[in-house]
């Protein structure tokens, strides 16, 4: 989810990955 930090569009996805 490191890329999610750089991409705001993937911000929501990063959250879901953290929950997993």
Swiss-Prot record:
Temperature dependence of activity: Thermostable when incubated at pH 8.0 at temperatures between 40 and 100 degrees Celsius.
Transmembrane intervals: none
> What are the GO MF terms of this UniProt record?
serine-type endopeptidase inhibitor activity
According to the UniProt record heading this chain, what is the dependence of activity on pH?
A: Stable at pH values ranging from 3.0-11.0 at 4 degrees Celsius.
Keywords from the UniProt entry: Protease inhibitor, Serine protease inhibitor
- Intrachain S-S bonds: none
User: Family assignment?
Assistant: Belongs to the leguminous Kunitz-type inhibitor family.
Function per UniProt? Inhibitor of bovine trypsin with a Ki of 2.3 uM. Inhibits 50% of the proteolytic activity of P.rapae larvae midgut extract at a concentration of 20 ug/ml. Inhibitory activity against trypsin is reduced by 43% in the presence of the lysine modifier TBNS, but is not affected by dithiothreitol.
Further comment found in the protein's record: On the 2D-gel the determined pI of this protein is: 4.05, its MW is: 23 kDa.
**Name by which UniProt lists this protein:** Kunitz-type serine protease inhibitor SOTI
**Organism name:** Spinacia oleracea
């Amino acid at each position: 989810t490191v890329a999610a930090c750089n991409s705001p569009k993937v911000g929501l996805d990063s959250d879901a990955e953290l929950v997993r």
